[in-house]
Amino acid sequence: MKIRVGVIGCLGRMGKKILNELITNTKVEIAGAVARSGSKYIDSDIGPIIANLGIKVTSSISGIFESSDVVIDFTTKECMLDCLKAAVKFKTPLVSGTTGIEGVDLKEYAAEVPILWSANMSVGVNVLLKLVKKAAELLGNEYDVEIWEMHHNLKKDSPSGTAIELGKTIANASKVDFQSNQYLHSGSNIRKKGGIGFAVSRGGGVIGDHSVMFVNSDERIELNHKAIDRTTFARGAVQAAVWLYENKREIPGLYSMQDVI
């Protein structure tokens, strides 16, 4: 029996990619697709989006959670909060890649239902996180750490969720407090010893570039990841949904792509 997957935010760039990945994955089938209330596609077949499958676009988040085995969300903080409440109500596992969610206590909801959240669903970025963690453990606090990221000119959150996750990974591995040691470059102040610096660029249609640098007076170690196509995020999200349903559907908890790979 195939896993029934619901998609929240089906008209967005990521939503469309995820729908396309779902129709090519033999383990899953599309349970339903949600768009924002007021969209001209509500009650229309998702055919114009991907393919004629006899599935209509809806604005009912609760309805999708009730009819799905697992739900994937790539939307906004406000919509994600509605998804979290619906996930708890219907005990439906949730996979989310929504960023800019400061102040949301995922652990509170994960105590009642399986939730997998990652700032970046790309397998490559999650390998980068493992490499960065190992580098930080080996190098300790003797190297300055700089994280640079670039995204398209419409991205709202800054630094990106992935950049912040990289910073937190380094802080944990180096045994320092992330909140008190992070800073975004501005003004003319000298960099803080042991600080984790962030630099941000926005322009054009860049999907996502991330670079982590460990620098001292003698050398620089640089680890990079560049996303070529958003398909990498969609494929990772579907992989995460399958993993969450097959392995943790009855085990509430907060999971990430680090668990999947």
Swiss-Prot record:
Pathway listed: Amino-acid biosynthesis; L-lysine biosynthesis via DAP pathway; (S)-tetrahydrodipicolinate from L-aspartate: step 4/4
InterPro entries: DapB_C (IPR022663), DapB_N (IPR000846), DapB_N_CS (IPR022664), DHDPR_bac (IPR023940), NAD(P)-bd_dom_sf (IPR036291)
A single GO cellular-component term on record: cytoplasm
Location within or outside the cell: Cytoplasm
Reaction(s) the record says it catalyses: (S)-2,3,4,5-tetrahydrodipicolinate + NAD(+) + H2O = (2S,4S)-4-hydroxy-2,3,4,5-tetrahydrodipicolinate + NADH + H(+); (S)-2,3,4,5-tetrahydrodipicolinate + NADP(+) + H2O = (2S,4S)-4-hydroxy-2,3,4,5-tetrahydrodipicolinate + NADPH + H(+)
One GO BP: diaminopimelate biosynthetic process
One Pfam family, short name: DapB_N
Gene Ontology terms for molecular function: 4-hydroxy-tetrahydrodipicolinate reductase; NAD binding; NADP binding; oxidoreductase activity, acting on CH or CH2 groups, NAD or NADP as acceptor
Keywords of the record: Amino-acid biosynthesis, Cytoplasm, Diaminopimelate biosynthesis, Lysine biosynthesis, NAD, NADP, Oxidoreductase
EC number(s) recorded for this UniProt protein: 1.17.1.8
Positions that bind NADP(+): R36
Catalytic residues (positions): H151 (proton donor/acceptor), K155 (proton donor)
Domain of life: Bacteria
Binding-site residues for (S)-2,3,4,5-tetrahydrodipicolinate, renumbered to this chain: H152, G161, T162
Top EC category: oxidoreductase
Similarity comment: Belongs to the DapB family.
Function of the molecule: Catalyzes the conversion of 4-hydroxy-tetrahydrodipicolinate (HTPA) to tetrahydrodipicolinate.
Protein name: 4-hydroxy-tetrahydrodipicolinate reductase
Gene: dapB
